[in-house]
């Protein structure tokens, strides 16, 4: 399996708690049919942030 590279989110929506955060679509290997799983990761100034209280 080839795990896709990290890339900008296509439709990131927004991050209510940190409006200036950057969205990245991050994929990692996983034990499923695709061989990987992906998630939206929000970061601000190099730190991962939560977008919802």
From Swiss-Prot:
**One GO term (biological process):** negative regulation of endopeptidase activity
Which cysteines bridge via disulfide bonds? 9-23, 15-51, 27-38
Swiss-Prot/TrEMBL keywords: Disulfide bond, Metal-binding, Metalloenzyme inhibitor, Metalloprotease inhibitor, Protease inhibitor, Zinc
Residues annotated as binding Zn(2+) are 53
GO MF term set: metal ion binding; metalloendopeptidase inhibitor activity
- Is Lipid metabolism a UniProt keyword of this protein? no
Question: What is its biological role?
Answer: Metallocarboxypeptidase inhibitor. Has an inhibitory effect on bovine CPA1 and porcine CPB1. Does not inhibit D.melanogaster svr (carboxypeptidase D). Shows no activity against serine proteases subtilisin or bovine trypsin, cysteine protease papain, and aspartyl protease porcine pepsin.
The protein's name is: Metallocarboxypeptidase inhibitor b
* Classification lineage: Eukaryota, Metazoa, Spiralia, Lophotrochozoa, Mollusca
